[in-house]
Swiss-Prot record:
Listed Basic and acidic residues bias regions: 26-36
ZnF region ranges: C2H2-type: 61-85
Gene responsible for this protein: ZNF593
PROSITE patterns given in the database record: ZINC_FINGER_C2H2_1 (PS00028), ZINC_FINGER_C2H2_2 (PS50157)
Biological source species: Homo sapiens
Region (Disordered): 1-57, 82-134
Tissue note: Ubiquitous. Detected in spleen, prostate, testis, small intestine, colon and to a minor level in thymus and peripheral blood leukocytes.
GO BP term (any one): positive regulation of transcription by RNA polymerase II
Function text: Involved in pre-60S ribosomal particles maturation by promoting the nuclear export of the 60S ribosome. Negatively modulates the DNA binding activity of Oct-2 and therefore its transcriptional regulatory activity.
Gene3D superfamilies assigned: Classic Zinc Finger (3.30.160.60)
Name this polypeptide is given: Zinc finger protein 593
Keywords: Cytoplasm, DNA-binding, Metal-binding, Nucleus, Ribosome biogenesis, Transcription, Transcription regulation, Zinc, Zinc-finger
Amino acid sequence: MGRSRRTGAHRAHSLARQMKAKRRRPDLDEIHRELRPQGSARPQPDPNAEFDPDLPGGGLHRCLACARYFIDSTNLKTHFRSKDHKKRLKQLSVEPYSQEEAERAAGMGSYVPPRRLAVPTEVSTEVPEMDTST
């Protein structure tokens, strides 16, 4: 038995890091900012939404809570019943970490437990389908 060469093994770590960065999704505080009712950046369902060929389903069916795009409304509704979506809604129900909470943790105040926020179960930017039954 001879000695085997392991060429190219040192590149696997950097490739894994690149793929991890590519699949990175927005953090919870960024999603909270989008879901805020008074936030001007909150996307609303737009019947005249522009079709984006780079996104699944043209970017028309999106779950805001999970920051994912879906091919059609059927897959989006199936996603609403999935374990991943329910887990993300549970994470979003806790108030995001703030500077005041960081100061209290450092001993500059008394502990106040984080508030529970009401998150709608079906958060999406789904565009209503056109009715062609005439």
